[in-house]
């Protein structure tokens, strides 16, 4: 997969993840299969009425995204979350997404559906870092996490509690 599909170059994405204090951002890896979903109008869907299969790497990555966001929900709702905190959280989430992308070994049909969802995650992170209503970015990520749980097989998946 090419990260330019998400509207940013490698340098921009890696710079965005540089705010991670605990972990350095991994270098994005190229998928063996490349899809462009950002402007395709692709819609997230089920696999003939069933959830898409996942692998341990994707499940761990999505749990990490959720675990980055969950502890901050109270402060976000209370409107005490600062612009700097939004930017740092967005950077950590982007770092988790880069890890998901670099470890992706899903079959092409599952991968295509994942990419539809990843666009929403990256859009949410971008909104969290921009001037304006940063909470809209959080809402987009929460909705993407909910959509993940509804469309991808992940035993014991827990959505964000809010």
Which residues are covered by each model-predicted region?
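Short, solvent-exposed, charged loop/turn and helix-capping segments
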Residues: 96-114
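Helix-rich interaction surfaces within compact, conserved domain-sized segments
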Residues: 103, 114-162
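Bacterial N-terminal signal peptides that target proteins for export
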Residues: 1-10
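Charged, amphipathic alpha-helical oligomerization/scaffolding segments
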Residues: 57-60, 64, 88, 92-95, ...
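Immediate post-signal-peptide N-terminus of mature secreted/exported proteins
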Residues: 22-81, 160
């Amino acid at each position: 997969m090419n990260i330019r599909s998400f509207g940013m170059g490698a340098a921009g994405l890696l710079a965005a993840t540089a705010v991670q204090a605990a972990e350095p951002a991994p270098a994005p890896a190229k998928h063996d299969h490349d899809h462009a979903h950002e402007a395709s109008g692709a819609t997230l869907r089920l696999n003939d009425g069933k959830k898409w299969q996942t692998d341990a790497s994707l499940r761990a990555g999505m749990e990490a995204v959720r675990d980055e966001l969950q502890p901050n929900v109270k402060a976000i709702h209370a409107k005490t979350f600062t612009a700097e905190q939004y930017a740092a959280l967005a950077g950590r989430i982007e770092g988790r997404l880069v890890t998901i992308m670099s470890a992706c070994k899903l079959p092409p049909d599952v991968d295509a559906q994942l990419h539809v969802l990843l666009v929403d995650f990256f859009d949410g992170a971008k909104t969290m870092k921009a001037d304006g209503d940063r909470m809209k970015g959080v809402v987009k990520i929460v909705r993407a996490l909910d959509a993940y749980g509804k469309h991808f097989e992940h035993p014991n998946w827990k959505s964000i509690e809010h």
